[in-house]
A protein has these predicted regions:
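Outer-membrane beta-barrel domain signature, strongest for Gram-negative TonB-dependent receptors
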Residues: 1-84, 90-98
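Signature of Gram-negative outer-membrane beta-barrel scaffolds
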Residues: 84-170
Length: 170
């Protein structure tokens, strides 16, 4: 859509929730569950010339939605050896939608006998791009800690992650 006489603005709406539950299975082990949800919606616009003719402007909409779940089991094998094992999952979608009218085409195109609106798209923008990224992550991890002395602790750990991503640019 044309951005002539655009009034710059920025709107942001963010939701972040997190729930952690710790369950002491016994004196030696604790199971922890961490669940989170994140949602961001942002819209903004800027005028490059800040004049009545709308010399140039952009309009951006960003959206992010993510869900994550982690389970951890931590415990002591004995007085000198402890462990941690866990699973992690995340599902995330990002959408970046932006358009730019660099020269105020909607205002000046009729002066040159040109249409101010592209009949194909219905926009007066120089360009318009929607970039969507979907990702899914799965991980398994663990560590073992050995208390060698009162002042020396040795930890070995590993993590395996698998990421799947798809990106589309329109």
């Amino acid at each position: 859509v044309g951005h002539a006489n655009l009034k710059p603005f920025e709107e942001l709406d963010t939701t972040l929730t997190r729930l952690q539950i710790d369950w002491d299975i016994n004196d030696m082990m604790t199971l922890t569950s961490v669940t989170s949800y994140f949602d961001l919606e942002e819209e903004g616009a800027a005028s490059y010339g800040y004049d009545v003719n709308g010399i140039g402007s952009n309009h951006t909409i960003n959206e992010t939605e993510a869900f994550a779940q982690e389970l951890r089991l931590a415990g002591d094998i004995n007085d000198s050896v402890s462990f941690l094992i866990g699973l992690f999952y995340q599902d995330r979608e990002l959408v970046f939608d932006t358009a730019q009218e660099a020269v105020g085409g909607a205002n000046f195109a009729p002066l040159f006998g040109l249409a101010s609106i592209d009949p194909t798209t219905g926009f007066s923008d120089d360009w318009h791009k929607v970039h969507t990224t979907d990702s899914e992550t799965r991980s398994i991890f663990g560590s073992v800690t050995f208390q060698a002395t009162d002042r020396l602790e040795i930890t070995a750990g590993a993590r395996f992650s698998e990421d799947e991503r798809s990106q589309v640019v329109d």
